[in-house]
Structure formats: structure tokens, C-alpha cells
Curated annotation (Swiss-Prot):
GO molecular function per UniProt: pyrroline-5-carboxylate reductase activity
Catalytic activity entry: L-proline + NADP(+) = (S)-1-pyrroline-5-carboxylate + NADPH + 2 H(+); L-proline + NAD(+) = (S)-1-pyrroline-5-carboxylate + NADH + 2 H(+)
Keywords of the record: Amino-acid biosynthesis, Cytoplasm, NADP, Oxidoreductase, Proline biosynthesis
Entry's family note: Belongs to the pyrroline-5-carboxylate reductase family.
UniProt xrefs under InterPro entries: 6-PGluconate_DH-like_C_sf, NAD(P)-bd_dom_sf, P5C_Rdtase_cat_N, P5CR-like_CS, P5CR_dimer, Pyrroline-COOH_reductase
Subcellular location: Cytoplasm
Protein name from the UniProt record: Pyrroline-5-carboxylate reductase
Organism field: Helicobacter pylori (strain J99 / ATCC 700824)
SUPFAM superfamilies, per the entry: 6-phosphogluconate dehydrogenase C-terminal domain-like (SSF48179), NAD(P)-binding Rossmann-fold domains (SSF51735)
Gene Ontology biological process terms in this record: L-proline biosynthetic process
Pathway: Amino-acid biosynthesis; L-proline biosynthesis; L-proline from L-glutamate 5-semialdehyde: step 1/1
PANTHER family noted in UniProt: PYRROLINE-5-CARBOXYLATE REDUCTASE, PYRROLINE-5-CARBOXYLATE REDUCTASE 3
Length: 257
């Protein structure tokens, strides 16, 4: 059985492991390594994830393995890598293929931008590949699809761009959810009921968005001189649409520094 090696053990690594371990453990031997990989042991035990913890010494043995990089981008050169990987899957924001290939020898490279919804196998993940070897590529893409859906974009810069749509976006949507919950409280709902209504609204909206464009959803809800269009006019006057676009742009720009 082939080996899938996770380098890193932070929030994203844990989310991916939680959402995909049942599928991945049938296809791969799972390994986790990093500076202090034993830190993830309580999490593995709690979630009943079968993975081997490999302490880091002088170098990480990557030979003939699928290697998933899930640490901070600036730590790429802090590790020594020994051997040639079959595939390097990188979730390192702002790190291009050239930097990856200079640091790690591999037959295949895949750059991706997953999000924290990986823990429910609901990540929306933009991917781009280099040095495509069909059999290796298929297995690498299957790894990505084990924790959500996979959107193949045209170039590696577009993977970085997807921070706006599926990376930082969940934090921005959380701010929206929190604001709607507080709005409900202001209008007289208790906190529990308000949050429950917001959660179901998000669930319903996600279903609507599968079939319809955002503009069409707005059109179906708004009536002439109605309550919703009145509220939307306030949001437009306050520049909420532009603020979201600017926030996403600044997140992408910060990542590319």
C-alpha cells in the first residue's frame, strides 16, 4: 500500500484528516510528521484516526510517497527532504511551483487551496498541477476529492485567487452569520432561536445556489417597495458589496507578498 505523508498538524491538517481518514486509510498508509508531531496524538485518539506519527530528525523521508504540505508557507525551507516523492500536494498559500520544486524533488506537483469545511468533507478546493503523470495525477486528485469537491483552475495564480471564494470566504461568511444572529436578537428573538434560524437560512441558501445565480435569488425574494429591497438598499448605500470585494482582494494581496 502506498504512503500518504502529512507534513504539518495544525487546524487545516486536522480538518482534512477528520473529513477524509475513513476513505484515505483504505488507499494509503497515513503518516504525520513535523517539528513536534506528537502534539496531534490526542486528536488522532479522539477521532479514532489510524495514522503513524513519524518524529522529525535530520530529514523527512519522502521517497515514493504522496506528500501533503500543511504547515505555514515560511516553514518550507526549515525542513530537509530526502528522496523523490511521487507527488507533492501543497496547501501553502503564495508558494509557487518553482519554489516547491526547488525545495522538494517530486514526479508530480499539485497546488491546492482547501478550507476548514474539509472536516465535513465539504471543502471547495481549487487545484492546479505541474509535471502531470496521469496515474499519479488521478491518485492526487482523489486525495483532494476525499474531503470535498475539486475545481481545476487554469494556472497556479488562480489557486491563490481562490482565497477570495473559498479560503478566507468562510471567515467572512461567519461575520455575516454573526451579524444576522445579532440582528435577530435586536428585533426580539432570543440568541438560541436567532442562531437556529440563521443556520437554516444558510443551509437553504446553499441549496438555492446550486441551481440559481445570486442575482436571481435576490430577484425572487424582493418585491416592489417591499421589506427586503428596503434592507438591501441600506447595504448598497453602506458599500457592503464593495467592502466584501475589497476585503477579498486584500486577503489575496497579503498572501502573495
Amino acid at each position: 500500500m502506498e504512503i500518504l505523508q502529512f507534513i504539518g498538524y495544525g487546524n487545516m491538517a486536522q480538518a482534512i484528516l477528520e473529513g477524509s481518514h475513513e476513505i484515505l486509510s483504505k488507499r494509503f498508509i497515513l503518516e504525520i510528521t513535523g517539528r513536534n508531531p506528537e502534539k496531534i496524538a490526542p486528536f488522532l485518539q479522539e477521532k479514532n484516526i489510524q495514522a503513524q506519527i513519524v518524529p522529525y530528525k535530520d530529514a523527512i523521508d519522502i521517497h515514493q510517497k504522496f506528500v501533503f504540505l500543511l504547515f505555514k508557507p515560511y516553514n518550507l525551507k526549515d525542513f530537509n527532504y530526502q528522496g523523490q516523492a511521487k507527488s507533492v500536494l501543497s496547501a501553502l498559500a503564495g508558494v509557487n511551483f518553482e519554489a516547491l520544486s526547488n525545495a522538494i524533488n517530486s514526479l508530480h506537483y499539485l497546488k491546492c487551496m482547501p478550507n476548514i469545511a474539509s472536516k465535513f468533507a465539504l471543502s471547495s478546493t481549487a487545484v492546479c498541477e505541474k509535471s502531470v503523470a496521469p496515474s499519479i495525477s488521478e491518485k492526487a486528485l482523489n486525495i483532494i476529492e476525499s474531503f470535498g469537491n475539486c475545481v481545476r483552475v487554469g494556472n497556479e495564480e488562480q489557486v491563490d485567487s481562490s482565497v477570495a471564494t473559498n479560503g478566507s470566504a468562510l471567515a467572512f461568511l461567519s461575520l455575516v452569520a454573526s451579524s444576522l444572529k445579532d440582528a435577530g436578537i435586536r428585533e426580539g428573538l432570543n440568541a438560541k432561536d436567532s442562531l437556529e434560524l440563521v443556520k437554516m437560512s444558510f443551509k437553504g441558501f446553499a441549496k438555492l445556489l446550486e441551481k440559481e445565480r445570486p442575482e436571481m435569488i435576490i430577484e425572487q425574494i424582493c418585491t416592489p417597495k417591499g421589506a427586503t429591497i428596503e434592507g438591501l438598499s441600506v447595504l448598497e448605500k453602506k458599500g457592503v458589496r464593495g467592502a466584501f470585494i475589497k476585503a477579498c482582494h486584500e486577503s489575496v494581496k497579503k498572501m502573495r507578498l
